[in-house]
Amino acid sequence: MAYTIWSKLYHSTTWVFCGLQLDSEKLAEQTFAMYPLAPGETLQLRDPDGTVMDERRDNSRPHS
């Protein structure tokens, strides 16, 4: 199991796996902090159990 980053785009209701799997929690947190956001996008960092550890949101567009 690995730490993963998930994305939900503006006006979407579906979370999409971003293709990044990291075994180290520290490396996952550092990568997540630097991951670029698209306008209106929401990103989640999830632990190996699928629990959301952190969430970032671009607020340049309203969210639904």
Predicted regions and their residues:
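Short linear sequence elements within intrinsically disordered, low-complexity coil regions
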Residues: 8, 15, 22, 37-40
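Acidic, low-complexity, intrinsically disordered interaction modules
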Residues: 26-27, 34-36
